[in-house]
């Protein structure tokens, strides 16, 4: 295809084009074409029917393509900018790290590059044509024009007059440009829903012109003075053009199909002689004629008669532009554009091609080329600032966002420091920081907000760590220490105060939040014992503790303290056995009123050791317990018993004692039994290493704790408790109303001796045996034990209450029934329970004391509590469970804090009603009964352990 115009890349002008341009002299009008494009050549000249010479043309950012049609006075400068889609796509592909792509920065960079190219066009062109692919005006252009005006007035006009002083044209004016360029807008696409008539198209163009004019006037882009106006708009001339008829970017395939269709649809007027010969062969007239409408005849197209056809013919971009070119050639370019005109000769400058090239070369070098040259040096300070800070000066959005973020940063810091305490921990710091960030977000916006938010966090963190950081050592109740981290302090303190009772329960005191196990389970109660009038008088059970033999004693290593948790297969089996201990105990005891454990060693071998190993091969036999009717027991054990059974023997506990196989005399036998128990009273305890935590079923039996975490005390005789009044305030303080009663528990016991041992009993003396039966046995060898028990819970506010079942708080005498005690004795009792003093379910009370009032009977009550918390089963740590004396009020105080091998077992935050045992529980079956030793004195013996001659009730 032969083109009737010249096309070249600046500054490589062809000789033919240069020669023809020289003929024009100073009648040369330079038109700059900028804007958007969507084709692969970045061609915005399609409306003027121009395109690059080569079909393989590759557009480059910053490249200027020149077009000139001989016979005209118009030189087109086609600027290729980042706003062309093909160039924009290349810039996106050049991004090195797509994952860290910053859209705001990329947009600012492309916009600044477009402004740089448009700045050059403002100074070297008479007319600017902005090409828009959309159907409406782009509002971002207003911002572009504002930035252009800022760059020209605040930067270019500071250095350009001095740098261009050597050019002769500069002496004609001080504006450093040929004129105030006239801006025209070319829209390549017309709205599809609008009619394509002269009236509709003109109305749409006029409406767009009014909107653009108001915007440019409102933002001072166009003013009354040419010296202060960035652009010019024509007066009473159209400056908006919509391409309504021509398809500037057609689909080539559709064009080929349409051409083929038109070639087939020929009229009779256009038929050639060859076509007539073919028509003669047709069987009838119109055989090969197409159906449908015929195209409009060429005569009609060549000779339009109506106004619409003429408007369609004249409504082209070329005609639209030439009207403004003629204004430039007639020296009336600024006539009517500005109310305040400039002096004659300074309004408009037309140059010949050589002078214009010199002008273009200098401005291109100043505005474009030197910017890309990083080694360029200049003595002009203003120009140096332009080269270095051009992008920064245009990024007004970033400055705006930074300003907002600075305001938000100050507000956030002020909010953080406003209510900060003297010392505070991580939780308080996080809370204050969250409030500071919320205060920052009220002002801070935009892309820099994330970095400023991180800066705010760093400033607040530094402020916190600058002498205000809290110790934050957690207490055993998970409360942080409030002391300063850097300041020396001998003792941690969380500032939390609890109210707890002493060992005997008579006196309540304020206790600080404990940080060590010794403070929690021992030191507080030792302190309370000094100020309590009852604690100093009561008789305490002495639990075994570590007694060092050297001065450099130490805590046992973890593997040594808990051997069952490490090692090979035997230890693994032991772990499996221990893991199922709690579950087996629960299955054996839960919900039963009958005694569930036959022997001492059968279900306590994981808590206090196996009696077979303790006795080291001794032949002391364990008691046998049988259940059922009294008749069956008599037939098996005492065939010579002639007494009749009472009607309440169904729930009797039958304890059968088997005497030793050989005995010289009664006294020697008793002495031998007592000696065996004492000799089996413990393992070879370590005197150099102690147990660091609480004793549990996995603990090494040879290791003892440094201090007792349990307390067992006889607070007085059984007469101090009255079931009519309950526990009085002067005796047990802090109980809630109605929850201060113990539960009566009747236990029926029948003692049975083997036949082979009857002769042995007769030798003990008839007088002693008769006193035993008369004073203590009713109905022969049957006796009823009247026991009072109470499971006391205590919250951190000092409120105490008893439970009548695992799910119910005792509410007074009405809740006490005949079988109420069985609900607490034969069922697992929760370690934690919601305190009724508050409505919040997460305010928990803890099982702290077991009250036992022993009966006046020739038996001793045995205590063997086992507390299951998590995977641990905690015990008293004694070789044999303690024996309680008769007719006395005993109180067992449980540990305040439970600690496992390597972790703290804290109370749960909240208990669910359907899983009240999730926080831990006291295993059922903690009570046992044993016959009083024959040589026991009337005074209670606290250090006498229970032998194998007892049964669990």
Curated annotation (Swiss-Prot):
Belongs to the SMG8 family. This is Nonsense-mediated mRNA decay factor SMG8. Residues 621-637 have a biased composition (Acidic residues). GO terms for biological process: nuclear-transcribed mRNA catabolic process, nonsense-mediated decay. It comes from the Eukaryota. The keyword Nucleus does not apply. Keywords: Nonsense-mediated mRNA decay. Involved in nonsense-mediated decay (NMD) of mRNAs containing premature stop codons. Probable component of kinase complex containing nonC and recruited to stalled ribosomes. Residues 621-649 are annotated as: Disordered. Residues 638-649 have a biased composition (Low complexity).
């Amino acid at each position: 295809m032969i083109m009737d115009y010249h096309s070249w890349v600046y500054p490589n002008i062809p000789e033919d084009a240069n020669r023809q341009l020289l003929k024009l002299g100073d009648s040369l009008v330079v038109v700059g074409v900028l804007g958007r494009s969507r084709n692969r050549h970045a061609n915005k000249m399609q409306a003027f029917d121009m395109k690059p010479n080569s079909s393989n043309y590759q557009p480059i950012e910053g490249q200027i393509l020149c077009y000139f049609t001989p016979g005209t006075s118009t030189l087109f400068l086609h600027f290729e900018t980042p706003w062309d889609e093909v160039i924009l796509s290349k810039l996106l592909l050049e991004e090195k790290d797509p994952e860290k792509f910053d859209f705001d920065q990329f947009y600012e960079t492309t916009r600044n590059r477009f402004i740089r190219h448009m700045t050059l066009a403002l100074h070297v062109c008479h007319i600017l044509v902005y090409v828009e692919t959309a159907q409406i005006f782009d509002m971002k252009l207003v911002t572009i024009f504002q930035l252009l005006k800022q760059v020209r007035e605040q930067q270019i006009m500071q250095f350009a007059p001095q740098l261009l002083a050597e050019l002769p044209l500069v002496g004609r004016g001080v504006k450093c440009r040929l004129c105030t360029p006239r801006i025209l807008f070319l829209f390549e696409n017309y709205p599809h829903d609008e009619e394509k008539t002269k009236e509709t198209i003109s109305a749409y163009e006029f409406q767009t012109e009014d909107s653009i004019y108001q915007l440019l006037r409102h933002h001072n882009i166009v003013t009354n003075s040419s010296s202060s106006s960035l652009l010019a708009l024509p007066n009473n001339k159209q400056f908006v053009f919509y391409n309504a008829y021509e398809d500037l970017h057609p689909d080539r395939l559709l064009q080929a199909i349409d051409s083929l269709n038109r070639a087939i649809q020929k009229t009779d007027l256009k038929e050639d002689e060859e076509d007539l010969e073919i028509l003669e062969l047709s069987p009838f007239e119109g055989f090969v004629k197409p159906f449908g409408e015929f195209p409009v005849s060429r005569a009609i197209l060549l000779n339009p008669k109506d106004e619409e056809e003429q408007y369609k013919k004249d409504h082209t971009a070329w005609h639209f532009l030439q009207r403004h070119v003629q204004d430039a050639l007639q020296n009336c370019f600024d006539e009517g554009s500005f109310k305040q005109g400039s002096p004659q000769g300074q309004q408009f400058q037309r140059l010949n091609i050589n002078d214009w090239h010199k002008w273009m070369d200098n401005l291109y070098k100043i505005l474009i080329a030197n910017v890309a040259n990083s080694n360029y040096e200049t003595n002009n300070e203003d120009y140096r600032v332009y080269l270095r800070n051009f992008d920064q000066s245009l990024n007004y959005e970033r400055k705006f966002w930074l300003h907002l973020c600075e305001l938000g940063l100050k507000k956030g810091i002020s909010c953080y420091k406003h209510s900060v305490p003297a010392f505070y921990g991580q939780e308080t710091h996080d809370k204050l920081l969250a409030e500071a960030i919320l205060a920052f977000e009220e002002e801070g916006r935009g892309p820099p907000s994330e970095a400023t938010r991180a800066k705010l966090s760093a400033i607040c963190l530094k402020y916190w760590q600058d002498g205000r950081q809290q110790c934050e050592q957690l207490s055993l109740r998970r409360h942080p220490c409030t002391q300063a981290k850097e300041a020396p302090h001998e003792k941690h303190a969380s500032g939390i105060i609890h109210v707890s009772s002493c060992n005997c329960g008579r006196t309540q005191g304020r206790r600080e939040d404990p940080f060590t196990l010794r403070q929690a389970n021992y030191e507080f109660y030792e302190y309370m014992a000094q100020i309590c009038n009852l604690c100093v008088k009561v008789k305490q059970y002495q639990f075994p503790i570590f007694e060092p033999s050297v001065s450099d004693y130490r805590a046992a290593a973890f593997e040594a303290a808990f051997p069952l948790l490490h090692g090979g297969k035997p230890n693994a089996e032991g772990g499996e056995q221990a893991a199922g201990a709690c579950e087996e105990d629960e299955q054996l005891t839960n919900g039963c009123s009958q005694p569930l454990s036959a022997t001492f060693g059968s279900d306590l071998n994981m808590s206090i050791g196996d009696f077979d190993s303790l006795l080291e091969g001794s032949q002391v036999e364990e008691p046998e317990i049988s259940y059922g009717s009294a008749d069956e027991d008599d037939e098996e054990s005492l065939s010579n018993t002639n007494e009749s059974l009472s009607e309440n023997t169904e729930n009797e506990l039958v304890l059968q004692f088997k005497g030793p196989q050989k005995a010289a005399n009664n006294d020697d036998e008793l002495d031998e039994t007592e000696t065996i128990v004492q000799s089996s009273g413990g393992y070879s305890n370590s005197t150099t290493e102690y147990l660091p935590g609480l004793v549990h079923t996995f603990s090494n039996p040879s290791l003892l704790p440094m201090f007792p975490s349990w307390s067992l005390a006889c607070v007085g005789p059984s007469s101090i408790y009255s079931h009519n009044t309950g526990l009085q305030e002067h005796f047990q303080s802090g109980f809630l109303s109605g929850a201060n009663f113990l539960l009566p528990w009747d236990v029926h016991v029948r003692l049975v001796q083997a036949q082979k041992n009857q002769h042995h009993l007769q030798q003990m003396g008839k007088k002693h045996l008769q006193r035993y039966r008369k004073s203590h046995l009713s109905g022969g060898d049957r006796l009823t034990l009247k026991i009072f028990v109470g499971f006391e819970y205590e919250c951190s506010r000092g409120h105490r209450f008893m439970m009548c079942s695992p799910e119910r708080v005792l509410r007074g005498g009405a809740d006490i029934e005949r079988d109420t005690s069985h609900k607490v004795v034969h069922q697992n009792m929760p370690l934690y329970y919601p305190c009724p003093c508050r409505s919040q379910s997460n305010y928990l009370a803890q099982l702290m004391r077991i009250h036992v009032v022993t009966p006046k009977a020739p038996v001793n009550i045995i205590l063997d509590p086992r507390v299951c918390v998590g995977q641990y089963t905690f015990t008293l740590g004694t070789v044999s469970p303690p024996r309680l004396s008769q007719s006395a009020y005993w109180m067992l105080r449980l540990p305040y804090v439970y600690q496992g091998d390597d972790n703290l077992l804290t109370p749960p935050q909240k208990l669910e009603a359907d899983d009240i045992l999730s926080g831990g529980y006291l295993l059922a079956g903690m009570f046992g009964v044993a016959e009083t030793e024959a040589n026991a004195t009337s005074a209670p013996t606290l250090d006498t352990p229970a032998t194998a001659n007892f049964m669990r009730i």
